[in-house]
């Protein structure tokens, strides 16, 4: 499996489907308040994936590499296997487009993620800009 494919499959594909993108910006941005927090695919238990510690939250040790989960905190987005810097957040027609610089233990890559806050407080993650269904995520901690 190639490095780019590995990053997609294990780094972000485990909780945040994304696709490789070109350079979008240079200054890191803080994600909007509606996106901040620990997110988990709705069919999973927050208590089995996250460990709250005061005002912060982290992944339970040992980390479940396959958990469909991510944490957005300030200018950072973390999955069980990747840590990303949010370069920019741009509004799309019905979703936010996040340009990310991500790193795993084996590679670093530029990635784009498509997410949208929903009226019911959940978040939908989209595979690309043509995905109309999305995958719902619940907020475990803010």
Feature map (PLM): residue ranges:
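Edge beta-strand at a domain terminus
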Residues: 127-142
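N-terminal helix-cap/turn-to-beta initiation motif at the start of protein domains
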Residues: 26-40, 69-72
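Short, solvent-exposed loop/hinge segments that bridge or flank secondary-structure elements
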Residues: 40-75, 79
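Contiguous, well-ordered beta-strand patches that form the walls/edges
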Residues: 69-119
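Bacterial N-terminal signal peptides that target proteins for export
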Residues: 2-13
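Bacterial N-terminal signal peptides
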Residues: 11-21
């Amino acid at each position: 499996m190639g490095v780019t494919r590995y990053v997609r499959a294990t780094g972000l594909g485990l909780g945040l489907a994304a696709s490789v993108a070109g350079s979008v910006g240079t200054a890191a941005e803080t994600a909007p308040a509606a996106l901040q927090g620990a997110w988990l695919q709705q069919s999973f238990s927050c208590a089995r994936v996250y460990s709250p510690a005061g005002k912060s939250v982290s992944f339970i040790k040992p980390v479940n590499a396959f958990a469909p989960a991510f944490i957005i905190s300030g200018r950072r987005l973390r999955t069980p296997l990747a840590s990303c810097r949010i370069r920019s957040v741009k509004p799309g027609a019905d979703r936010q487009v996040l340009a990310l610089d991500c790193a795993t233990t084996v590679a670093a890559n530029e990635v784009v993620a498509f997410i949208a806050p929903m009226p019911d407080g959940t978040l939908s993650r989209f595979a690309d800009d043509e995905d109309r269904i999305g995958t719902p995520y619940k907020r475990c901690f803010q």
